[in-house]
Amino acid sequence: MKFGRLGELKHGYNAMTTRDSDMMMDIGYQVMDAGEELSFQDPEQETAFVILSGQAEIRWNGQSEKMHRDSLFDENPYCLHVPRNTKVTMKADTAAEVLIQKTDNEKDFAPKFYRPEDVQADIFGGGVWSGTATRTVRTIFDYSNAPYSNMVNGEVINSPGRWSGYAPHTHPQPEVYTYKFDRPQGFGACFIGDNAFKISHNSWSELSGGNSHPQVTAPGYAMWYSWMIRHLPNNPWNKTRIDDPDHEWLMQPDADEKIWSPTKK
């Protein structure tokens, strides 16, 4: 269990987690200037590139695509996912920020370029608990559409004052959250097991397997976060969810009838 803050991002690579940590993944933000060109090629790790802002051209194996993003909150992402030892070149057409996720994988697979229309977006928590945990969950790739990968990559949009990762639950696989707000002074709270941490812009949390991990954002501030899971050997995350027994009653159809409200008499 760990929590960290990057503050204002610097030009270049801004590291958060490393492959030799409990998270088993290299994760960081690559900040690029307009016109800058960079190449990446990891001999041992698969890699996912998710554009967060700006516009860039990305090239691999003789192919080329444009990635762009004006809003984390209103737009689904572009993502390139490649196996180990694949050379990828990015050229920023404008100032750009890219999330990079990597982990060990001996499997060779065909690179996959995900466009916004390829990303699954679901509304979770709708119609229950007076809407206090309604959020948008985006899944770029997971075990269902990329069983060859050792990773999962997706995003959550928390509306102001709402919860996510709720009701409290666990899974054995490690997970990393990286956070951004619609305003840089935005804040929220991250609960990891029995510990709580203040979420700020460009902070991140490392969720060890077996810990519940609900999140909440303050009223007035919308929160985006990337959720990245590392599969375990012979134990992939396949939408794995173990509900906290203390809060299982919230999952019952009549839960709203049992929740106190000032309008009830």
Model-assigned labels for residue ranges:
Residues F73-D93, T103, I199-G220, M228-R230:
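Conserved metal-binding segment of the jelly-roll/cupin
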Residues R84, A92, I100-N105, F141-Y143, ...:
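Short, structured patches in soluble enzyme cores that scaffold and shape functional sites
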Residues I27-Y29, A34-K91:
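Extended, compositionally biased flexible segments
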Residues L6-S39, G127-V176:
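A short glycine-rich, His/Asp/Glu-containing loop-to-beta-strand
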Residues Y78-L80, T86-V88, T94-E97, T136, ...:
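Generic beta-strand structural signal
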Residues P43-S64, V82, P160-G161, P172-W204, ...:
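Glycine- and acidic-residue-biased ligand/ion/polar-headgroup-sensing regions
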Residues A96-T136, S226-K265:
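Double-stranded beta-helix
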